[in-house]
Amino acid sequence: MPEAPDRAIRTLDLFAGAGGLTTGLSLAPGLEVDAVCAVEFDLSAAATYTLNHGGRIEDGRVVGGSVYAGSIQDWLHEVEPVEVDLVVGGPPCQGFSTLGKQNVDDDRNFLWRRYAEAVKRSTPRYFVLENVPAFLTSPQWDVFQDELESGMLADYGIEVDILNAADYGAAQARKRVIVMGHHKDFPAPGLPTTTHEHQHRTLDEIFQDIPNTVDRVGLPEGTVTYGGVDRPGAFATRELHFGRFYTDLSLKRFASIPEKGNRFDLPDELLAPCWRKHRTGTADVMGRLHLDKPSVTIRTEFFKPEKGRYLHPTEDRAITHYEAALIQGFPENYQWVGTREEIARQIGNAVPIQLGTAIGRRLQKAFSGSLEIRDETQASRVA
């Protein structure tokens, strides 16, 4: 096991994305996070992570930080093991809804194995694994439990539940599996305590200071170099309040949808042919967000109203990247690198900041207790 840290908690962030989980953890009172290493395959997301966690722009290049910009498989093969106090990450588990059409042993469906391997070799006191609710009913979950019983994670116990980010202060009803793992030499941290279960934050709180009108289409100008490639950026969150070009038909549809409405409110002449044939189905498609409720889950294509309930509550447009980032809890000055689609993916894949902070509060208490236990154990051995 690594030595007890003097102050900062040495953290390894896997499948790190834009850094939402680490950012949330770092905002927990009393928990000082030292992100000693992050692993991220998407280079634009890696650049975003770098700029917000130890990196900087120097002569137009993103430099510094401690991000391995590549696959976790390559990282495990190329990099010497790093001992840390905490491992966090959300391994992508693809194909839950179509496993019958896929090889269930496809490595893409078992990237969490690489996560488990990283835990085994990094020997953290604690780990946090985030995933979609379907993880708990997948073959991957069964194998994960086998690893806990007698495999790579046999030295660890876990606590697990499906948590709603809205219960922890996010203005978003986003449900995710959270697995809190602890080495058996140290106490279980417990799952986060809800703070807003009976009083969810609403979109009105998020949107009240944002201009309703959008007078720009597309990203601002500017590029930075990362990985030897020029990429759009870096942009502060507040610079992401831009729209997109809509067809006249789309604008007519938006104008016909009332507050809290959706595609079922459209007159017949504005319905797409597929909607005429299918009068049932989800009410979220082409739906307006509700000002008096949390947002629905922000996904990676939130800028497309046909993908879900992503129309602005009152304006005839989809929500902007700026609005989506604020719903996810990102700070106004967070720095972003990438194309419109890449930044949307970074925003949509992130762990809501408030949920990360709630997890951090539990870990802070656990680390405080575990450090005391660790010190007493060392003292008795010395004696």
Where are these regions (language model features)?
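Core alpha/beta nucleotide-donor-binding catalytic domains of modification enzymes
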Residues: P2-T123, P133-T137, W141-D146
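Short, hydrophobic/aliphatic alpha-helical segments
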Residues: E3-A4, L153, E332-V337
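Extracellular structured ligand-interaction cores
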Residues: A8, R174-R176, K293-S295
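Short alpha-helical patches at coil-to-helix transitions and adjacent helical residues
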Residues: A18, W141, R176, N349-I353, ...
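Short Gly/aromatic-enriched secondary-structure transition segments
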Residues: N52, T194-E197, P313-E315
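Class I S-adenosyl-L-methionine
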Residues: W75-V84, F96-H278
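Short glycine-rich anion-binding loops that position phosphate/pyrophosphate groups of nucleotides
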Residues: P91-Q94, K184-D185, F303
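C-terminal target-recognition/interaction regions appended to catalytic cores
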Residues: P232-A383
